[in-house]
Structure formats: C-alpha cells, structure tokens
C-alpha cells in the first residue's frame, strides 16, 4: 500500500513533537480573524493525524497559549473492531457505527476517535480477534484502517 503524503499545518507549540497524534476537530471561533487560519485549518475534520516533522516556523495564536508551530503531518492509521466478514487486508470498507452500547468494554474500539462514519477506509492489517465477546453477538476482528 502506498504511503500517505504529508501535509504542512499548524498545531499548538506544546503539541508539536514528532509522533504526537491528534484528531482534527475543525476551526475555532477564535480563528475567524487570524491571518494564517488557512494554514491551521487545512485538515479533514474528524480524522486522526500523526506529526512527522516539526518545522521552525512559529506564529502567535489566539487558541494555543504558547502559539502555533508549523509541522508536517500524515493521516494516522486507526485501530478498530469491524465485522469479521469485512476484515480482509486491502479491502475497502465504509464505516457505519451500528452499536450504541456505551457501557460495553469494546465501545471505544467499535467507535474510535479519528474515524468518520460514512467515509471509506482501507483495511491495512488484521490484528486478530476481538478480546471481548460482542454484546450484540457479532463476530468481530481487530483491524488497522487508513483513509481510502
């Protein structure tokens, strides 16, 4: 599978460390008048990113206490549980969150941060069976997915 391209964006200076992962939540109201807001808000809302490289460029920021620093990011893989019949390496899946059992121990793996419902992803790796039995009786596999 081809490597994901990197993208330059701005993040809070405190977070600007290689390997740090974050989920982009979108533009804040404080960004409205910022002259560099396009550089900060150039990612896909709800997607998980990993910082690859930290650059030396720094800007004052109304959102981040210590300002914002330029970084190179790539979309990070996400580990989640999916139906066993969809868990095939390199297969494309459309994520649909069909379970609302928030008390389930596997809930955070069935509905992980950084995955957008309705979007398509590629199964990059099948990591194994679910560690817990699904409360809805479904056969689940633990997989690593990337945006399609």
UniProtKB/Swiss-Prot annotation:
Paired cysteines (S-S): none
InterPro entries associated with the record: UPF0179
Family: Belongs to the UPF0179 family.
PANTHER family, per the entry: UPF0179 PROTEIN MJ1627
The name this protein goes by in its record: UPF0179 protein Mboo_1959
Organism from which the protein derives: Methanoregula boonei (strain DSM 21154 / JCM 14090 / 6A8)
